[in-house]
Regions:
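Conserved small/polar residues in nucleotide/adenosyl-binding loops
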Residues: 211-218
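A structured beta-alpha segment of the ubiquitous adenosine-cofactor-binding alpha/beta core
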Residues: 47-62
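NAD(P)-dependent dehydrogenases' Rossmann-like dinucleotide-binding region
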Residues: 5, 9, 120, 137-161, ...
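N-terminal Rossmann-like dinucleotide-binding module
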Residues: 1-43, 123, 133, 191
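Active-site rim elements
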Residues: 118, 174-181, 207-210
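Beta-strand-loop-alpha-helix segment that lines the small-molecule cofactor/substrate pocket
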Residues: 63, 69-70, 74-122, 136, ...
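Oxidoreductase and adenylate-handling cofactor-binding alpha/beta cores
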Residues: 123-145, 181-208
Length: 218
């Protein structure tokens, strides 16, 4: 396995791969040296790269795992499939529907496996819930209300202002699609899974609510 993207999510996967005896991580890639150094400490025998294309040139690598920022998912996945690698790519699949379609079309022609990391698909509690829904335990499903309780900040400290966008990419429109791709993708996927259908129409609205504030009445 070659691993591309060794930040927080990448290192989470790398630690989990240590529990799988037949998962042999032989190469690591990241364009941020501190992350690459941390990952290399987990797999000291693995080759290291700062350019994913050099990793893909290694013919001994059968599969790659991609845990880069969202804006890099599409082109790295497509390049990996063209290089003859199986691909596990973190969610969300890509920045745009057009990018997702491009990835899918290349995958269909490649003869390789492409898996997007929507982890609820193999979470036992979600699987059990879907079995009950599809068996009719709750009757006909006419609507779904999902929510996410999270009190965390996406902003991370940076050692230099020049690294702001590299490290805090989730906060910038050119690199991320915000809450919809970072969190709501899970909820949308659950809705499609539960109903066994894809949406015909989509509408959205949003707001920033400050429920913890006490406002004067006069």
């Amino acid at each position: 396995i070659g691993f591309i993207g060794t930040g927080s999510r990448g290192q989470y996967h790398l630690n989990n791969l240590k529990t799988i005896p037949y998962a042999d991580v032989v190469a690591l890639c990241d364009n941020y040296p501190p992350h690459l150094k941390e990952a290399s400490a987990l797999y000291p025998k693995a080759k290291t790269y700062d350019d994913y294309r050099k990793l893909l040139d290694d013919r001994d690598i059968q599969a790659v795992m991609i845990a880069t920022p969202l804006y890099e998912h599409a082109h790295i996945t497509i390049d990996a499939l063209h290089a003859g690698k199986h691909v596990f790519c973190e969610k969300s699949m890509a920045m745009t529907c057009a990018d997702c379609l491009d990835m899918y079309n290349v995958f269909k022609e490649s003869g390789k496996v492409m898996f997007i990391g929507q982890q609820r698909l193999y979470d036992p509690k979600y699987i059990k819930a879907m079995e009950m829904i599809h068996a009719g335990t709750f009757g006909e499903i006419n609507g779904i209300h999902t929510f996410w309780n999270r009190n965390g900040d996406w902003r991370r400290s940076v050692p230099s202002p020049s690294l702001e966008r590299l490290i805090n990419w989730r906060l910038y429109k050119e690199f991320s699609k915000g809450l919809m791709t970072e969190l709501a993708c899970h909820q949308l996927q659950i809705g499609s899974w539960a109903l066994q259908k894809l949406p015909e129409k989509v509408m959205g609205h949003g707001a920033v609510s400050y429920t913890h504030l006490t406002l004067p009445t006069s």
